Amino acid sequence: MKSVTIENHLESLTESSVIWERYTRDAKINPNRYFVFYEGEDRQYYDCRIQQYTETYNTYAVGGKSKVLKLFEKFTQEGESTLANKLFFIDKDYEHHQVNPDIYMTPKYAVENFYVSSTAIKRILKVHFGINDDDPEFGRVLKYFNERHREFIDYLTEMNLWAICCQLNGVKIDFDLLGLKNNADNILKVKYKKLELSVEDISFYYFERKYGEKLREKSESGLEKNGRDYTAELSYFMDKKEYIRSTFANDVEEYRSCIENYFRGKQLLWFLKEFILSVENKSGGILQKQFFIEDRNIMTVFTNCADTPE
């Protein structure tokens, strides 16, 4: 039986059924408002953009993509007119096609991707560091950022292609097992002058092998988390291995050619944070420290500097 913890309680508050109850209550009081539904903490990105068009809206942080889609389905079952003043936002993740024209899906993996680009770093330098684009520091930082960003993408391209191939074959990767859900600290260190790899191999087959090892460790330990059967997961992963390899060998060029659209957003956001901390470093840095950033506040701090796709 699932134990009751603070984490479980907070998770329950984002369940589709709970959000539906909140919405129906709010809609009775203010039926003419806009009602906005999105994944987790994405409000940090969307809210300031929605405010450009209206101040009269309610927002609801639904747990994840599947829960947003479940909620959308419930609205459509109630009748098409119920979508009139509703906005739904989801991340693209590794999806290749639009899920539904009535749902906004990011053109890149997640909203975090909009924070990490040459245009975004230019805004960050101007707005948060007060550096003009004709100042020498501006050009230096921009040059290093573009170089390190390109290297970061290149280093982790095969990791993302491996995950895409897995998903195309019905295997959804748990990046927590690899210690890579929110960053890439297990693989490399970010310095503004260079990226330092912590492992010798970052190929498709490295991630395939490491993931199998992690599943096997969990299976042999007999540990289960929330009823998760690691033995069954390992068996399924091994059964799919050759199909996944075949997909990688024959069917990924379309993804590879635009890999930045399928690149894990949280890892990119971590890269941005580490890069900025490096250029602010007292020993050999370029810029003076202006503010405190960490994983929990970086989206809020830089939200006005992030790209806004058309």
Predicted regions and their residues:
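Acidic, divalent-metal-binding catalytic cores of TOPRIM
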Residues: 1-310
